[in-house]
Amino acid sequence: MPIRPLSVLTALLHVYIALRLLPALATLTPAWPLALVLLVVSAVTMPLPFVSRSHRADRKAKPAGETLHWIGLISMGWFSSLFILTLVRDLGLLLAWLASALGGLQVPDTVAPWSALAVLALATGVSLIGFFNARRTAGVKQVEVPIRGLPAALDGFTIAQLSDIHVGPTIRNGYIQRIVDAVNGLGADAIAITGDLVDGSVPELRDHIAPLAGLRARHGTFVVTGNHEYYAGAHAWIDELRRLGLKVLLNEHVVLQTRNVRGAQTDEELFESALVLAGVTDFTAGHFDAAHASDPHLALYDAPPLVHTRVLLAHQPRSAPVAAAAGYQLQLSGHTHGGQFFPWNLFVPMQQPFTAGLHRLHDMWIYVSRGTGYWGPPKRFGAPSEITLVTLVPAQS
């Protein structure tokens, strides 16, 4: 949406909230002037992230652009909660009015002002907590995935999953370094980054993504593209990530040998301790580049048939039905952020088959990460960020 229509829409939404809250707060001094100031500041600053894009190419203006982004995104997060809570309040007042008109229920005069104050307080409180949750280093979430027929050599194999970091205007070098330090402390066998790593071009973000070169795992770090890589120039980012030593999987796979098989006499001996780790491009990648159309079947092309443990990295959960049909035992995904903050988690199922956590689809498991960073407003509430440590274990018969 162009900046001008977006600014008009933002202004109209602020007018709606002002009309619904300010009259009710008139009897609560100093709540009324405080609410007015907050609404004015929000209305003025919310469009700033879009305006600040024009500063990105100008190095002298870069600090100003980053400041505008921070202010605007914080306002956006606060207003998002304020808007939803105002709608909920209006629905509650409507139901109370109907109960009064039809059933004779007496609604105290204090309900309107105090409910308006509660909306303001809750939106502010949720935003403050959400800001802290978003800016802290993601916690480690341990997940065991039971795999039928898992070879003994793969029992306990670990994959550290990062997803949806969204390096950009508010996620910078220091934030990434903290993630790298946390992941390296896990001692995982492999590291998987399941897309939406960046929100900007290579020249803008090269320095901030550089710490990823320090990721350490026995079998290396593997990356698949998300939709945001295509917004930011996927081909340039693929080259940059490979320059950093990360292995980008574009509808392809690698075979990971988990122990020394030197001297193996048969194919069974050669592959009994192996794992196929495949990766596909983003579910929507074909809209940006036909050659990048996502294909879980193609990712298994020429995979050793005797290696039955097959793990797929796919940014969006929507890849799961085709992945299950292709014969994978596990798909690791992200994209949803778990909704990031209430109530948006309620809307994720409208677009994705799974929102967060471990799920079963036919004979395949799918794990959906809530994401390691955040997108847009620096705010997480009810959907904590995570570094996921996935451990493969034998399924109980």
Identify the function of each model-found stretch.
Residues K141, P146-S397:
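Soluble catalytic domains of enzymes that build or remodel membrane lipids, polysaccharides, and related
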Residues M1-R136:
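Non-catalytic terminal accessory segments
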